Amino acid sequence: MAKKLFDFIVFDWDGTLMDSTATIVKCIQAAAKDLSLPIPDADAAAHVIGLSLGDAMQAVMPNVDPKYYPKMAERYRYHYLLRDHELPLFPGVREMLTDLAQQGYFLAVATGKGRVGLNRAMNSANVLAMFDATRCADETFSKPHPAMLQELTRELGQDMQRTLMVGDTTHDLLMAANAGAASVAVEYGAHDALALASLAPLYSAKNVFELHQWLTDNA
């Protein structure tokens, strides 16, 4: 068996492990509608997924009065909480995580979600025990700042050079680059394949099964 390139695999959550992209887009649009603000189109709303909630609201609606951003965040939370218990993991995620853990990898999540939201989602999906550590945007800097990866590697005593970030957005890949970690993209989430390819990930998976196979063969 070939020597592993990585010891530590860090996953984004929304759009990478959980099938939540479309729901997040609809909740951003519903929040804007509630406040009678211009409703962002689906592409604009999807682009900000992965950022902290505050940064996402500013990025998706840069031309509105800043006083609306906290209200947008509140309305977004309202709509998301109505739906989040229905959100599934992508097919194959549970099996992939189980297999990777059995192979001896350290596993973590780095997400733009808040701590309460991530814990609720992970408990609902019954995967909390599969991860060695997690980091949320309300605990440190938002992506693409490298802090999440820096803190996770420090917490688990891992080497950044042997750390792999897996995500569906350019925010994930930029965070990895900023931290000095390698990255793999997934094309089934929020950002399109062309945008992801521009950041030269080691691999770009079209689905979880391709991702699982690549990690098994190459990571």
For each feature predicted by the language model, list its residue ranges:
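Short, acidic loop-to-helix structural element flanking the phosphoryl-transfer center
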Residues: L82-V109, R115-N119, P146
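Alpha-helical elements of Rossmann-like donor-binding domains used by nucleotide-donor carbohydrate transfer enzymes
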Residues: K26-A30, D55, A59, R75, ...
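Active-site neighborhood of HAD-like aspartate-dependent phosphohydrolases
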Residues: A2-H47
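Hydrophobic alpha-helical segments typical of transmembrane helices
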Residues: C27, D41-A44, S52, A56, ...
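A metal-dependent, Asp-based hydrolase signature
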Residues: I49-L81, P91-R94, D99-A101
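Asp-based, Mg2+/Mn2+-dependent phosphohydrolase catalytic module
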Residues: A2-I9, A101, G114-R115, N119-A219
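Short helix-capping segments at alpha-helix termini
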Residues: K33-P38, V64-K67, Q102-Q103, N126-M130, ...
